[in-house]
């Protein structure tokens, strides 16, 4: 790749959009070759720059991207987004899980017309993605406190709201009962996939965390925005 782009050239951003999953077939060998290609892309990124990978939000393509992510992380690269967790991706533990983003989007009129004619809905853009740092750059420190990126839709149950969050401690269920709703935690009931939140006063419950009337929820970033704080 670097030879085709020109000897010694460096770029602020190198992007691969709906391309990686189309290359090298299937299986472990394909994943290894995709990881090697990403290393080539990262080698031509300037310090402080990024390689951005965007793939379809389907389960299989997403899980393949996460498997490539694990290989890249194992080789010493840092993920700028969406990951806070620095180990092997916890979404790969269960075959039914995957990770994708869902961003609200106002389509151009031409796209709206085509979508309407095809019977499609295009109120949002769904994708699986990685933003990777070049070799030698450290993981960015997450915001202070107990921080999670919401990686599910709202999982409503009888008298409660639940989400899956993924943060520095891994993938965790977060739940809050309506009877424990307060002004300090009310934002929990309005979260969207991709939001970054800070949680306080949460209690371990089963394989997740239960929020109480003492809990506070701070929204540090909405989906697609950089996390601050």
PLM region spans:
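Short catalytic/ligand-binding loop motif for oxyanion handling, primarily in non-cytosolic enzymes
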Residues: 22-24, 60-62, 88-89
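Short strand-turn motif at the edge of the Rossmann-like AdoMet-binding core
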Residues: 54-58, 83-84
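Conserved Class I S-adenosyl-L-methionine
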Residues: 64-88, 93-106
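C-terminal lobe and adjacent flexible extensions of AdoMet/dcAdoMet transferase-like proteins
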Residues: 98-229
């Amino acid at each position: 790749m670097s030879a085709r782009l020109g000897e010694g050239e460096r770029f602020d951003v190198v992007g691969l959009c709906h391309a990686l999953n189309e290359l090298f077939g299937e299986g472990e060998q394909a994943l290894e070759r995709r990881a090697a290609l990403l290393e080539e892309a990262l080698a031509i990124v300037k310090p402080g720059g990024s390689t951005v990978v965007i793939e379809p939000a389907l389960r299989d393509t997403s899980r393949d991207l996460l498997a490539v992510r694990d290989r890249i992380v194992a080789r010493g690269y840092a993920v700028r987004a969406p990951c806070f967790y620095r180990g092997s991706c916890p979404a790969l533990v269960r075959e039914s899980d995957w990770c994708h983003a869902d961003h609200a989007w106002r389509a151009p009129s031409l796209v709206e017309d085509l979508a309407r004619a095809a019977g499609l809905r295009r109120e949002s853009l769904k994708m699986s993605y990685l933003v990777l740092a070049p070799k030698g750059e450290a993981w960015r420190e997450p915001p202070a406190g107990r921080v999670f990126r919401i990686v599910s839709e709202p999982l409503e149950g009888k008298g409660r709201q639940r989400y899956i969050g993924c943060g520095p401690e891994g993938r965790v269920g977060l739940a809050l009962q309506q009877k424990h709703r307060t002004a300090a935690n009310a934002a929990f009931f309005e979260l969207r996939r991709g939001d970054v939140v800070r949680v306080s006063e949460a209690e371990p419950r089963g394989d997740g965390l239960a929020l109480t009337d003492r809990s506070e929820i701070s929204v540090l970033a909405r989906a697609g925005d950089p996390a601050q704080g």
